[in-house]
């Protein structure tokens, strides 16, 4: 439908082309401009309308197929071993050494235990480790005024204490996405409790690749600062991340409309989509820290991010470090995460050929991430 809206201005020459287009794209600009100018206006409008209608119909069909699919995620078999407010530490068992897993604040922790066959937690348990998953939960009354420092100090700090008690000593931590930044701060605050730190698709230089940040910065400017401000709604958070790939939603549901409802990949799609659509609100002070401190002011890369008065400097990390840089990540650009790898002292670095989420739960996740990370945990931690 966006093509239909742009047709008139494009035909009249009112749409200018960006000077920053990649060379391969720019090579097609002149032929497209010439073809539009030469086309019969009414005929072109009919063709564009027909194509837009077809795509919209496929999109709606895909959404209906998704909503009617019978798959439901089975209940987790993990048991809570610690809780504070809305946050819990889930123990997946296993005879190996405890490993503390820390996901992002803005998505459900289930991405690390998505479904049978796509569960990092289950793989760790079955391969000589004892995964402990920090489930941040949904912000409630106790978390209304939590900033990132409160989440790190009170919730992550409490979970780390519980994990070290179970282990009888320091434990390795694995932070995914935003969770990596939080674990880095915790590791610097409690070096004696952390045996190693793995950072998976973790941003650091938020200005290294600013594509898609317009929505983030606009939201940051509109955030109120009064105490007791309600959490940032999940619908707004999802809209911000959807803006990074504006055409992805319609494309994936059009593709889903053509998939066999009984195929394993269809179940995988539904499981992931259920997780994406079941996001978590973000406490307003924490949202300000992220959108203003990180995205607008780039405090981590500038050396200006502080937690409880301590500057968060990766160079100060004393335990072994592991960094995963997925090369096809659209959520955390490789340049942003790569800056963290550069700032750490002698980390082990891998570069899975995957996206932000595919690295963790895709068909090649075991060989691309789980196995090298599991080996590193056993050798270095």
Segments from the language model and where they lie:
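Gly/Ala-rich beta-loop-alpha elbow adjacent to hydrolase catalytic centers
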Residues: 174-183
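Catalytic histidine-centered segment of alpha/beta-hydrolase-like enzymes
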Residues: 331-334, 354-368
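Short beta-strand immediately N-terminal to the catalytic nucleophile in serine-hydrolase-like folds
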Residues: 173-175, 200, 324
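Alpha/beta-hydrolase active-site loop
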Residues: 145-165
């Amino acid at each position: 439908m966006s093509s239909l809206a742009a047709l008139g201005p494009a035909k009249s020459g009112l749409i200018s082309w960006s000077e920053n287009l990649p060379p391969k794209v720019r090579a097609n600009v002149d032929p497209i401009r010439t073809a539009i100018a030469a086309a019969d206006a009414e005929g072109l409008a009919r063709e564009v309308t027909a194509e837009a209608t077809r795509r919209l119909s496929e999109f709606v069909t895909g959404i209906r197929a998704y909503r009617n699919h019978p798959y439901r995620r089975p209940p987790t078999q993990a048991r809570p071993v610690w809780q504070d407010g809305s946050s819990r530490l889930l123990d997946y068992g296993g005879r190996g050494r405890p490993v503390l897993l820390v996901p992002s604040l803005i998505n459900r922790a289930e991405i690390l235990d998505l479904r049978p066959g796509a569960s990092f937690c289950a793989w760790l348990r079955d391969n000589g480790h004892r995964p402990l998953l920090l489930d941040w939960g949904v912000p409630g009354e106790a978390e209304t005024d939590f900033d990132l420092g409160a989440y790190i100090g009170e919730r992550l700090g409490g979970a780390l204490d519980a994990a070290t008690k179970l282990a009888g000593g320091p434990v390795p931590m694995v932070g995914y996405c935003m969770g990596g930044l939080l674990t880095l701060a915790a590791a610097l605050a409690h070096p004696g409790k952390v045996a190693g730190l793995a950072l998976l698709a973790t941003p650091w230089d938020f200005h290294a690749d600013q594509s898609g940040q317009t929505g983030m910065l606009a939201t940051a400017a509109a955030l109120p600062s009064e105490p007791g401000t309600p959490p940032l709604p999940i619908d707004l958070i999802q809209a911000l991340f959807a803006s990074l790939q504006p055409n992805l939603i319609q494309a994936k549901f059009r593709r889903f409309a053509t998939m066999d409802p009984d195929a394993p990949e269809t179940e995988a799609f539904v499981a992931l989509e259920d997780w994406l659509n079941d996001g978590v609100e973000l406490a307003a002070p924490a949202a300000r820290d992220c959108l203003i401190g990180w995205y607008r002011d780039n405090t981590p890369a500038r050396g200006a991010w502080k937690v409880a008065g301590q500057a968060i400097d990766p160079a100060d990390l004393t335990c072994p470090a592991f960094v995963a840089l997925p090369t096809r990540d659209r959520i955390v650009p490789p340049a942003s995460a790569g800056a963290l790898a550069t700032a750490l002292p002698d980390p082990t670095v891998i570069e899975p050929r995957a996206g932000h989420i595919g690295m963790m739960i895709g068909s090649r996740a075991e060989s691309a991430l789980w196995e090298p990370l599991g080996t590193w945990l056993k050798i270095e931690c």
